[in-house]
Amino acid sequence: MIGGRDDYPESGFSLPFEPGPRRMQIKRGIRILGIDDSPFSRGDRESNLVGVLMRMDGYVEMMEKEKIQVDGDDVNRAIENLFLYTGRVARIIMMSGISFAGFNICDIDALYQRIRVPVISVFEQGGSVERMIAAIEKHLDDPEKVRILRSLKPVEIRNNGYIIMANLSGIDAQSAQEIITRNTIRGKFPEAIRLADLVGKILGR
């Protein structure tokens, strides 16, 4: 049992690491909540955040939206709300990237700790965290956003012959790879975020 007496040395000092996430049992009907945002224009104060609830095979069950502040810090709260609006049945949160509505940065570890649902943040190979950090330091001077970005440890995912990247919380890389692959019909990106992206583009018109 994790956290039990046997997990600690006799001296009483805790282990110098936290146990990593265990291999996940992935059932065919597992629900995924796909997250992406809407485009916004210069001068906009808000943007839409879209949540698409679907089964692993791509069957869509529900869509919801929530407002977030441009360059704000409320995206974690908005994702929690989308999780609640869709009935708390999602067993995976899958999002497109880590930054929404400009530099509204999702803290995926904090999100996982709040809702206890594994988080997969998928993005294109070659995305530069350092460029994002430089822009935040220049325009926003927000150390918390910088801290979140520096804490990320992206892993490489091979999907349909493509290489993409993912940041993970509460899930191991092998399970994330399987979920991404099984939720992809064609191309490099899974249906959950592909559809959330399409809906977001419509709402942003």
From Swiss-Prot:
Q: Name one Pfam family in it.
A: DUF99
InterPro entries, alphabetized? Endo_dU
Q: Report the PANTHER family cross-referenced here.
A: UPF0215 PROTEIN MJ1150
Record family assignment: Belongs to the UPF0215 family.
The entry's protein name is: UPF0215 protein Ta0042
Protein species of origin:
Thermoplasma acidophilum (strain ATCC 25905 / DSM 1728 / JCM 9062 / NBRC 15155 / AMRC-C165)
